[in-house]
Amino acid sequence: MGQKVNPKGIRLGIVKDWDSKWYANSQDYSKYLLSDIKVRDYLFDKLTNASVSRIQIERLANNAKITIHTARPGIIIGKKGADIEQLKSIVSKMMGIPVHINIEEIKKPELDARLVAENIAQQLEKRVMYRRAVKRVLGNTTRLGAKGIKVMVNGRLNGAEIARSEWYREGRVPLHTFRADVDYSSYGANTQYGVIGIKVWIFKGEILNHKKGTLDEVARRGATNQIAQKIK
């Protein structure tokens, strides 16, 4: 099962956190969800050169907080903060509420699955041999402390007539272990032979101390509520 599903989705509430944090009734849920999708698409497109890995959206009572995880914060902030103020006004109009934008710098982009996949895609678009690009990434990631990394490339590799998939792995990537901190991302490289799909899994170690609100605690609270209802 762990081999098939999205490694991030199956670990939500255990070792991974949600990208959107808000509560809504049934009438507003779809509106908020569509708004989040539009904002994320706009920011990823606008900040293509800023190495953005993740965008978290948190809705409060009458405003919203957006946290942008990036390896190049200077590009987003701009000179004297002019660019981020302009970005804030545009996003506020899109969401219809005041927005506060927070920038979080990624210290080690080589350990971020999205940035690694994006790096491979950029090299493939510059006509670098895919084996050289992947092996360079494998070496950099393991050298900076990753326990394991797995990369899959799929498409017309090196301009071959028939598309194929190739896998590369360094270390171990335990997809069945829920406490394992596995980062995952997919990306597409637009080459002259077509789109080459790239998938990256990075294992950073096991998280033994679960945070408050894990699935175990949720299940425990649910069982307690059922017992209380039976007693009543």
Swiss-Prot record:
Domain KH type-2 per the UniProt entry, residue ranges: 39-107
Disulfide bridge partners, by residue number: none
CDD domains associated with the record: KH-II_30S_S3 (cd02412)
PROSITE patterns reported in the protein's UniProt record: KH_TYPE_2, RIBOSOMAL_S3
Gene Ontology CC entries for this record: cytosolic small ribosomal subunit
Domain of life where this protein originates: Bacteria
A GO biological process held by the record: translation
Sorted UniProt keywords: Ribonucleoprotein, Ribosomal protein, RNA-binding, rRNA-binding
GO molecular function: mRNA binding; rRNA binding; structural constituent of ribosome
Keyword RNA-binding: yes
Description of how the protein assembles with itself and partners: Part of the 30S ribosomal subunit. Forms a tight complex with proteins S10 and S14.
Family according to the record: Belongs to the universal ribosomal protein uS3 family.
Role, per record: Binds the lower part of the 30S subunit head. Binds mRNA in the 70S ribosome, positioning it for translation.
Name of the molecule in the record: Small ribosomal subunit protein uS3
